[in-house]
Every structure is written in C-alpha cells, then in structure tokens.
C-alpha cells in the first residue's frame, strides 16, 4: 500500500505550485493538495483540510502559510499525521500583531488577491 502525502500550499498559491512534486511523488505515494483558499482563519483552513482529506493518516507538507496550517493540524489532529515537512515557514509563534496581519491577509485573499499582492510585494 502506498503512503499518503498531503501538500499544503502557501498564500496566493494553489495546487499548481506542487505540479512537479505531485507528478514525481505519485509513483510512490497517493498525493493530494489541500485547498487553502476557502476559509478566513488558520483554524478554519485546518478544519477544512482535515474534513476534505481522503486519507485517514498522511505525511503532511506545509509551504509558507501551509506550514501554519500544518501546525494547526498537528495541534487538532496529531493522530492523523505520520510525518511532517515544513518549507519556508516558521516554528516560532507569531506576535499578536503578526498573527492579526496574517489573518487579515487570509481573509482578504478570499475576495481580492490583487490587494494581497500589493501588500506583500514591498516585503519581498
């Protein structure tokens, strides 16, 4: 039986960011990409991903914002995660100011991606 891998993209990314990884990993694992575009908080994103995941247990990979969601999944359903990969994210807790900014960007991304891009570009 193939292992299950659940990939979580970053803010302003969708499944296409993992196209090549899905193609390569599909030879050895069942791979799916979580949709992080449908909720307004990290907690809600994690709940949505867990509800929609086809596998009961999986290796979880979080990229950027996906890493924050992965940590929330680890807090809420650790029994479902058999391995964790974090990329371009942080394990340090956000300050309350940083957390509020991130949550506002997630909420804004649901309605106005251009505005999110305008806010993030100067930070690059």
Cite the ranges covered by each PLM segment.
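Gly/Ala-rich beta-loop-alpha elbow adjacent to hydrolase catalytic centers
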Residues: 62-66, 70
């Amino acid at each position: 039986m193939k292992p299950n891998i659940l990939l979580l993209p970053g803010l302003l990314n969708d499944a296409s960011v993992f196209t090549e990884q899905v193609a390569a990993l599909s030879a050895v694992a069942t791979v799916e990409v979580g949709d992080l575009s449908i909720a307004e908080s990290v907690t809600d994103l994690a709940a949505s991903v867990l509800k929609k995941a086809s596998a009961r247990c999986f290796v979880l990979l979080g990229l950027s914002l996906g890493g924050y969601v992965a940590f929330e999944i680890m807090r809420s359903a650790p029994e479902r995660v058999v391995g964790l990969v974090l990329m371009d994210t942080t394990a340090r807790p956000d300050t309350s100011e940083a957390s509020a900014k991130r949550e506002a960007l997630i909420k804004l991304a649901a309605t106005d991606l251009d505005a999110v891009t305008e806010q993030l570009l100067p930070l690059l």
